[in-house]
Each structure stands twice: as structure tokens, then as C-alpha cells.
Amino acid sequence: MASGFEQPDIDFLILGDRVEAVNGKLYMMGGAWDRLNVVDFNQPVPFGFAVGILIPWNDANEALPLTITISGEDGEKITPDLQTTVSVGRPPNAVKGQSFRAVIAVQGTWKLPKPGTYVVRASLTDGRKEVRFYAVPIAHPQ
């Protein structure tokens, strides 16, 4: 049965406190938030994000360019673009015409210059997905 779409597509982009992709599965702790509490904007803060990509049958075994950016509300990037390629093969037991999902997890520490709105954006060929989050100051825990 055909997958119903012809182009690779970003299925999801999700933020998390801790993300990891192992053997095609996503492991996440503290996921799907849109508010990040920051004690000190002079220090980098840890968080990650996961990208799920649906790849149609005809694009299996192709290297697809993926670019991820993190920017502030003014559009200024807080880190250089993260660039990679995504490729999935067809396993021997694949159903002809099926789509395949690739999962990418990026964990890091990021320097957010000030309180405000930030955008994580993933771009793949013609598709794009973005998620906004709000960095807010909090008092240092006692």
C-alpha cells in the first residue's frame, strides 16, 4: 500500500529536557514544553529537541539534507546552523510502497542571551517545521 505522500516530510519537532534516539526509537524526559525557566542568562542551559522525518518509499537510500536553527525573536541565530543528512534504507521485510520514519535527537547546552521568545526550526528539502519556546527568568533555588 502506498504511503500517500510523495516528498520527505518533517512529521514532528519537539523540545525536551533530555532526548535520545536509539535504534529508530525516541527516548525523552520532560518533553513537549514551551516554557524554559532560566536561573542565569550568562550560563548555557541544557535542553534538546527531536525531529521525526517521514520518508516515502522512492526516497529511501537517498541522502536528504536537514538543517536545524535556533534563533531569538529578532531572528538572530544563537548558534550556527546544525546541518546533517538523513538516509534510511529499505529493510528486507518492508511492505512495498511503505514510508519510513527517521528519528533525530539533538541534546546540547545553549546560550540564550536574554528572556524572550526563541524558535527552533527544522528544514528538509521543501518541508519545514518550527516550535517556539519562552525563556523566562526565575530566582536561584535556595
Question: Residue ranges of each PLM-predicted region?
Answer:
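Contiguous segments within soluble domain cores/interaction surfaces
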Residues: A2-L124, R128-Q142
